[in-house]
Structures are given as structure tokens and as C-alpha cells.
Amino acid sequence: MKVKKYDQFNESVYQAKLANGLTVTMLPKTGYHKTYATLTTNYGSIDNTFVPAGSTELQRFPDGIAHFLEHKMFEKADHDAFQIFGQYGASANAFTSFTKTSYLLSATRHLKENLTTLLDFVQDPYFSTATVEKEKGIIGQEIEMYDDDPSWRLYFGMIGNLYPNHPLQYDIAGTTDSIAKITADDLYAAYRTFYHPENMTLFVVGNFDPDEVLALVKANQDAKDFTAFQPIERKIPETAADGHDIIPYRTIDMPVNRAKSIVGVKGLVPIESGAAALKYRAAVNVLLELLFGDTSADYLRLYDQGIIDDTFGYDFELQNGFNFVTFSGETDDPAQFDTAIIDVLENWRRSVVDQDDALALVKKEMIGRVVFMANSLEAVANRYDQRLFGTATIFDEPAVIDSLTLDDLTAVAEQLLQSQAISEYQIRPQAKN
């Protein structure tokens, strides 16, 4: 078992890779009553074309299958995993993102029983035609609910602009038509391909002894038989390096009282995983704070002019294989909103060049936020992404942020904020009859 010490935080992270390939990462934290765990597979909504385990041919699976599989994992032939967690006083949940699926556990007692339940229910799938058909109705209602959500439509409308030929454009849950095609055999094929321990990580943080937890997990895994791991072959379409495939502008009408607008910027340069990805994320976040933080000159100017208001916000998405930034808000004049945001992006140098004092202040604020998040077990676990950031944890982030210079931000801005990578998407109020 490897140990990585963070003396400045008085924390130690323990990691081991088991014989079956499962990576176990543990962060014991004394003084906490709760323990939080995530069991994650590197399988998300964009992984809809792959070679199923045991096969040699690429196969296209219905959109939404990763999310559908996540929903069905809790249900077994004669019980529901939630019932067992409830018996041991634990809460459980799961989520599917573009690139991964995670199963979450939170408990203040019975850690042995709850960790065992987490491992066992995820590693023992049960799908039948009847239960799959029943789930289609449940997920279909969820999809329809999101289809009626203007904020959701705005966000995925922008993704569709930035990635029109990429599975990113599809809702993580799929569509009612796509999930109607999912079969139990499809779920088993996806499960066998992506839910092998070699493609999964277990992260445990909270009040426990790492030697005891590792022994528990090892014994649990040694008692199970797994087929040999077949390296995963995915087919993810390439996107244009010069951004020529980006849709520059779209608008739709919806029953909203006030227009919504979003400006997006697609990262055109691939980002290497590991330390480079961690630094890139930190640099982009600092850059965005300099440009649009609520004390920045441009933010205050646009706010005073009434171009943006308290509904304004920005988001940076960095996952394995893609990254993009969005700026959105409600507005009475979508064209004016978009023009103002794009002006700030294209004239980023006025917020970066010679702004040493502003940089120092933003870095201090961001380090403070990270240190604060490090006290949250959920934040520590959910920010861990071995596939993207390697062995780095939240405790590596302050040093990375502190090391950033204006030259670093200039390099990132020149790389990311390219005019040909910008797109606009608007939702306007429907005309009243």
C-alpha cells in the first residue's frame, strides 16, 4: 500500500491496486463521525460506441444506456440495495456524467456492512425484460421533465452547438426514443465491458482505519471470480481542431417569462491527463475569476449597466477528452448580453496583463475555497478523478493554484479563448396567442 503525505494539511492518502485490478484510495480523517465512499467506473454517457467484452466488433448502443444501467443496478431479483443500506443506517445514491458512473455511500456506523453492500450490489447485476421495460417508463418521465426545463435545454443546446457531431450533444439520460431500444442484453453487454474492477476505483474518506478497510475490500474481492479484463475499445468522434464544426448561433422559443442566453467556448486543444490537467483546471478557474468574478471590473461594469444580473453565472467543464466554458443568464436583450460577454472574452488581456495584485487576491480566495472544501467528505471524494488527474487529490490543488503566474494565465487564455471557438444559444419567450 502506497502512502502520500500532505504535511501542511496533516493528511495522508493511502492507495493500493488489488489483484483483480480495482484501485482502492483511502483518506482517513479523525474527528469525523461519518464515512463517505464512491465506487466509480470509467463509463459515461458519451461511451455509446464500443467493442463489447468478448467481442471484436464495434457496436453502437442506444443513447442513455450508461444512465439506464446506473438506475437498474440497485434492483435485484428479490430485493433493492437501498433496503439493505437502510437497515444499516446508511444513505446511498448514484450519478452518471459524460465520462463516469459513481455509486455513493454515506454512513456513520456499520462501515463493514455498508462497504460490503456497496461492493456486492455493484458487482452483482440483475436485469430482466420485465424490470427493464418498467424502468423505461420511469426514466422516460425524468427525460420529459428535463425537456421542459429551460435551464437544462439552454445548457444542452449550447453543448449541441459546440459538439454537433459528438455524443456529448445528447442528454445523459438519452431520449424517450433511444431508451425504448435498450434491452436487458444491452445492459449486460455494457456491464461486462465497463464494470470490470480494472476499470473501477473505490474512494473511501472519513473515520476508519485504512488497514482494516483495505483488508475488508481485499477479502471481498478475493472471494469473487472475474473474467480476464479485455482492454476497452471506445469510438469517440474527433472534433475539428480549428473549430469549423461549431454551430455559431441557434435560438428556440419556450414558455418562459424572460429570455435566457448562453455563450460557450470550446477548448480546441487536447489536455493531457495528470498534473497538466490539474494545472489547466486551476488556471482556467483563476482566469475566469479575473474576467467575471463578482469583484472584477468587467463584471461590475456589466452589472451596473443592467446587462447582467444575479442570474448570471459561468461554468467550466473539464473531463477526459474535452473541455468547455459557458456563461449564461436571464436577459431582456439576448443579443446585447451575448455581445457584452464576447467582448470581455476577446479582450481578456485588459483583465490579465500587469494584474499582479488582482491575481494574488484571486489565488488567495480560491485557495481558501479549496481548503474549506477539504473539510467536506463529499467534496473530497467527488473531486477525485484518477482517470483525469492521476493520483492527485484536493490537497494537491492549493500548491498548484499558488504556483500560477500571469504568464500561465496568458498561455491558457491564448489557447482557450479563440474567437472561432465561441458560440451563442438563446431561449426566447414564446409569442402569446
Spans of features found by a protein language model:
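His/Glu-rich zincin catalytic helix
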Residues: M1-D80, Y188-Y191, Y195-R301, V412, ...
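Charge-rich, well-structured scaffold segments of protease-associated domains
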Residues: K17, D80-R234, G274, K279, ...
